[in-house]
């Protein structure tokens, strides 16, 4: 099974080797046909401490690194 890859923006980068990434999900409501935007924050492992707040990053599923970190950074733009 392929691993999920999401694109998001770094919202917090204060901890060592850990960042918070906000991912936007856009979908259309089936009943009311309204476009809805939802954001979800993921705790992501940043091995090299290469991210700053506001960076656009791609994250990928990974084995659990800690109790909350199950994602790693693939690419920083």
Swiss-Prot record:
Signal peptide feature range: none
Keyword Ribonucleoprotein in record: yes
Molecular function per GO: rRNA binding; structural constituent of ribosome
Cross-referenced Pfam families: Ribosomal_S17
Listed GO biological process terms: translation
Subunit structure: Part of the 30S ribosomal subunit.
Role: One of the primary rRNA binding proteins, it binds specifically to the 5'-end of 16S ribosomal RNA.
Protein name: Small ribosomal subunit protein uS17
